[in-house]
Amino acid sequence: MNTREIGNEYEDKSVEILVKEDYKILERNYQNKFGEIDIIAEKNKEIIFIEVKYRKTNKFGYGYEAVDRRKIMKILKLANYYIQSKKYQDYKIRFDCMSYLGDELDWIKNIVWGDEVGF
């Protein structure tokens, strides 16, 4: 399997988990002029922007470590554009990372708090 196929596999696993926990999947691999986010979901009037990361081993770090300041700034711009264009201004906003080390999931909720960055 190439890296794209592996990425899709773990995004699929993440979607399965989200659906089991009653999240509604709004978008997958959403792109706009600011970048791309793996999953956008909704639950209880909250929009969740989710980055999925996979590492076979932690030799080069954990997946969530790839969600650095630069990536976060792109996600924030992308999210703001999405919220405005889709009319979700009355929703709370959350940013998560679903990070896999092998098949072990570390779901980090609120990697950035929306109200801390002006949402």
Swiss-Prot record:
Entry's transmembrane regions: none
Superkingdom of this protein's organism: Bacteria
InterPro entries found in the cross-reference section: Restrct_endonuc-II-like (IPR011335), tRNA_endonuc-like_dom_sf (IPR011856), UPF0102_YraN-like (IPR003509)
Pfam entry (one): UPF0102
A molecular-function term among this protein's GO annotations: nucleic acid binding
Family named by the database record: Belongs to the UPF0102 family.
HAMAP family reported in the protein's UniProt record: UPF0102
Name recorded for this polypeptide: UPF0102 protein FN1370
Species the sequence originates in: Fusobacterium nucleatum subsp. nucleatum (strain ATCC 25586 / DSM 15643 / BCRC 10681 / CIP 101130 / JCM 8532 / KCTC 2640 / LMG 13131 / VPI 4355)
